[in-house]
């Protein structure tokens, strides 16, 4: 545990609540002190859904501390069972209430005997895993629970569907453009004549989980959630899974080719016809997706050699690193992820596509890295958006965590062939807006503003006088930030407090600003 005013991935119980609130007729009970109840408000605000968030807090108060939690927790489970009639109730503590070291598993077992609903305790180590890891573990636990129950009741049908079919695992609430990605992947599978067996956990019923083994394969669009479930199916049922991220034209083609290999392998067993998706890949790449054509246009060639920095979750950071570097000719000077548990896979994916790699969940290190790199554009999370604004660097948001403006009401997938178009737009426009700011500044547009000192730290820098600020304003905007930082660096090294025009020219000679 650590004290921080910003976290890229939240505490473990948030991941469990996200899985529970994604599923149909599932209720979560959170054993937590006051102050941990913000999930309901956060989800209602960001997802803009009409339904109430199915999560209830069993508050740890002074009475609980004096007498223990069992009576209160069991009463809350029974109350929600009577009021909501859910198929499943998931009981989870928070990192704070875990300090009490109470046997919540025993509470869940006792409640399940009395309740008409199934009750399980989220088996997550709240001190060792974050929000995304907990979501992955909780999803696998719920799936395993219902399949084991069906196996004991001898109601588990392991026969596969006649036509090729797939499960889509890992789409869930508060995900970055997850709803749009789900629609795009449904369309992709429909184009490939593959039936969608089930989507979990988003919109899925726990009573239908027993039908998951009927699919020919599992598709895992995100590394963060769904991988443990896919590995469980591979081990227990021999079901293949595809974890190649269908983002960008190149990886999109590779993902479809993997689907083709698995479908043709199973076609021999089920006496179905083999498939050939190469004409589909060619047609989509050349005529449907505009990104492939755009990457060869003169507009995109203007970005060749430009530098950028990418940071986000492992899935989006890896893909957004490869797309500009491989498909648009943009140099990625730094790329990184806050998913430290997936560092090995991340490094393997972006090998050769960037100059340096940063694996950290410390936003201060990320800010310092961005300040050193001085990129032409920045792609990251909401935090990198703030950092870019402070450093006057054009920026785009490509990964969670994000604020409400990135929960788009319009259709904006990042996966699939339509996703390639949606990615190309913000990548190009982020760079283009840098030139727009320059033109607005030259012609006295609405964007003229006082130049502020840019620094990734909170210390007070040297003071610019009116003459030096006037001289600085004459420098084009795209080079101004670099000149400003180099001059301030020179002033600090020389112990100069007030920056004059003479100091600016001295810094230029020494630092080649």
Swiss-Prot record:
SUPFAM superfamilies found in the cross-reference section: Helical backbone' metal receptor (SSF53807)
Annotated organism of origin: Ginkgo biloba
GO cellular component, one term: chloroplast
Pathway(s) it belongs to: Porphyrin-containing compound metabolism; chlorophyll biosynthesis (light-independent)
Names of required cofactors: [4Fe-4S] cluster
Keyword Metal-binding attached: yes
Annotated gene: chlB
Record-listed substrate binding positions: 434-435
GO biological-process terms attached to the record: light-independent chlorophyll biosynthetic process; photosynthesis, dark reaction
Cofactor note: Binds 1 [4Fe-4S] cluster per heterodimer. The cluster is bound at the heterodimer interface by residues from both subunits.
Function: Component of the dark-operative protochlorophyllide reductase (DPOR) that uses Mg-ATP and reduced ferredoxin to reduce ring D of protochlorophyllide (Pchlide) to form chlorophyllide a (Chlide). This reaction is light-independent. The NB-protein (ChlN-ChlB) is the catalytic component of the complex.
Pfam families: Oxidored_nitro, PCP_red
HAMAP family: ChlB_BchB
Active site, per annotation: 299 (proton donor)
Protein name, UniProt field: Light-independent protochlorophyllide reductase subunit B
The keyword ATP-binding belongs to this UniProt entry's keyword annotation: yes
Family as reported in the entry's similarity comment: Belongs to the ChlB/BchB/BchZ family.
Transmembrane segments annotated in the record for this chain: none
EC assignment: 1.3.7.7
